[in-house]
């Protein structure tokens, strides 16, 4: 999962040998530089540690550091789901979490859950009620339909962003790519 998320962040990176530092677009609010979505403006300590490893030629260690960071950064998704029984849904949510943050991921999930369990507050905080609704939805066993709903809400989220005119085409492509990968796991 983590390797796929890193590839979605930088399609030229396929593993340790191709791991690189890239300049962010001027309109990106993550800073000036990134390593597969790990930005100097958002995670400076992690970025600097990984860059130091790359500068020292420790590419394998830098790659492992990136993978572990993605897993640690998105671990809340596994806690929401409660098990590894729904890898496609877990992947899709982890990818969005890494790309857009916990609150935005919580909101798209809650919008999907509210569709089936009306009355859920959409605040981006996955608390006991959201988890109960999620577990109920997952117990129905239709992960592909749930993924369809998540994809729809993720695309709607991207379209609502102020920076959609600048980054929207790439965001929607990533959403589609993540959806395809998630379906292969479901």
Q: Which role does the model predict for each range below?
A:
Residues 1-186:
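Cell-wall polysaccharide-cleaving catalytic domain and substrate-binding groove, primarily
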